[in-house]
Amino acid sequence: MTDSFDDGLEGAHLDTLAIRAGIVRTAEGEHAEPIFATSSYVFANAAEAAARFGGEQDGNVYSRYTNPTVRTFEQRIAALEGGEAAVGTS
């Protein structure tokens, strides 16, 4: 279960967006965004893995593609730029 703190940020100052945009809290109740350093994820079965890698099911597959830490970064940049979405690359 996650709660997005993006609600209510419409019209927020850039400083607030830089700190608060894209934050999603997990069921763990962390105070700050966790850093997901994992490189891969566990799947319940091969069918679930195939659906995720095929883009048929939402969820993480491999950190080089996306992970919650990168998603928070992308959402924060999109909010700062006033865009719908952003893509983080290196």
Predicted regions and their residues:
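N-terminal glycine-rich, Lys/His-bearing helix-loop that initiates the first secondary-structure elements
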Residues: M1-N60
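Conserved N-terminal alpha-helix of the aminotransferase class I/II PLP-enzyme fold
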Residues: A47-S90
